[in-house]
Amino acid sequence: MITAYIALGSNLNTPVEQLHAALKAISQLSNTHLVTTSSFYKSKPLGPQDQPDYVNAVAKIETELSPLKLLDELQRIENEQGRVRLRRWGERTLDLDILLYGNEIIQNERLTIPHYDMHNREFVIVPLFEIASDLVLPNSQIITELVKQFADHKMIKLNP
């Protein structure tokens, strides 16, 4: 089995419930085991500011699904939970992104792993560090170094 990390985010239709439903759906994927999940964090939107705050988390899974099959399954879960893409970095009921898939580096028209720009996003790095404090990314970046830039993050840890 391959260890993968999934970022979860929502800012519409009761975001905490959206994340819980997504985690349940991920745990039910074939040949996949949900290992652990970070705390949930409330964060400001990355893009347009005329939208509600987000709730974000990171999940660690073990899977036998290929990266593209995992992507297909995550997009199916997004769609089942009412995901509509209206604008770039806009509001959404659910956003599921593959951050890491083993030590693989993948770049094609459908998928980029490690997830592009993840190292600059506090709502990814802080929860990822919480569940994988000894992680080394495929490009040799070390999570303990990446998280230092977010020592003064403004996210609020939730206890859902």
UniProtKB/Swiss-Prot annotation:
| Entry function | Catalyzes the transfer of pyrophosphate from adenosine triphosphate (ATP) to 6-hydroxymethyl-7,8-dihydropterin, an enzymatic step in folate biosynthesis pathway.
Please name the InterPro entries in this protein's record. Hppk, Hppk_sf
Tell me what organism the protein belongs to: Haemophilus influenzae (strain ATCC 51907 / DSM 11121 / KW20 / Rd)
What Gene3D superfamilies does the record point to?
7,8-Dihydro-6-hydroxymethylpterin-pyrophosphokinase HPPK (3.30.70.560)
- Which terms does the UniProt entry file under GO BP? folic acid biosynthetic process; tetrahydrofolate biosynthetic process
- EC number(s): the record gives 2.7.6.3
Protein name in the entry: 2-amino-4-hydroxy-6-hydroxymethyldihydropteridine pyrophosphokinase
Which reaction does this chain catalyze? 6-hydroxymethyl-7,8-dihydropterin + ATP = (7,8-dihydropterin-6-yl)methyl diphosphate + AMP + H(+)
Its organism's taxonomic lineage begins at: Bacteria, Pseudomonadati, Pseudomonadota, Gammaproteobacteria, Pasteurellales
